[in-house]
Amino acid sequence: MKKIFTIIGISFLSVSSLQAQTPVEQGNFIIDVYAGIPNWANSILYNNVEPDATQTDVRNYKLNGGLLSYGGRFEYMIADNFGVGVDVNYEVSGFNYDYTTQEYNDVTMQFENRDYNIDYKSKKLRAMARLNYHFVQNDRLDAYAGFAGGYKNVNRSIATNDTNYDDGSINGALIPVSFRIAVGTRIYFTNNIGGMIELGAGGGALLQFGLSAKF
């Protein structure tokens, strides 16, 4: 009987020790690689064609960049519950379509149909410093709340064979600052590799998901 209680006691201590382990602790490095959805510009602004009033027979409309954004995050645990790091993400949005317009021919003195193509791209890069507070931790789960702030750059370009438009590009964001508030969870499949999901406002997509590694 004494041996049975001894075995039960050792088992209880072992389980308690396992549950007390945390997936991250002071001194750990954490790397996240993620995709984000939605790409707000493509989902809302460019999802439906809005051609110029002079453009008729719009066709072959497609989005540039798709509906996802992509990014990476690096974090260093300065304490068991606090981490500091950098969050960088990138997205491309825009549209491409063919259209027909009527132009006056000075030789024939008649209006004639002309076919053109227009291609618009907006490339957005954000680089933000970040602070995370890890409020739930066990042997496999790491839940956190985060705040990030930093720099945003936007590059816009228009390419067309329509002589009534000028090809060109515009560099710089109207407000070159980006902020993000988020809550997220990492679930570790092994001691070092897991998956992550984050819900946030500003500074990227509403929902981010991907892989996480800690060292």
Residues covered by each model-derived region:
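Cleavable N-terminal export/targeting peptides
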Residues: M1-N28
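Solvent-exposed, glycine/polar-rich loop segments of beta-barrel outer-membrane systems
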Residues: L45-D57, N105-Q110, T160-I170
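Extracellular loop and loop/strand-boundary signature of outer-membrane beta-barrel proteins
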Residues: Q55-N60, E112-D119, D166-N171, G194-M196
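Short sequence motifs at beta-strands and strand-loop junctions characteristic
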Residues: N60-L68, D119-R126, N171-S178, F189, ...
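Gram-negative (and chloroplast) outer-membrane scaffold detector with strong preference
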Residues: I30, A35-N39, L68-T160, I187-F189, ...
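Glycine-rich phosphate-binding "P-loop"
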Residues: A148-F179
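Solvent-exposed loop/turn segments connecting transmembrane beta-strands
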Residues: D139, M196-G210
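Short glycine/proline- and aromatic-enriched beta-strand/turn motifs that initiate or cap beta-hairpins
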Residues: A20-Y76, Y144, L206, G210-K214
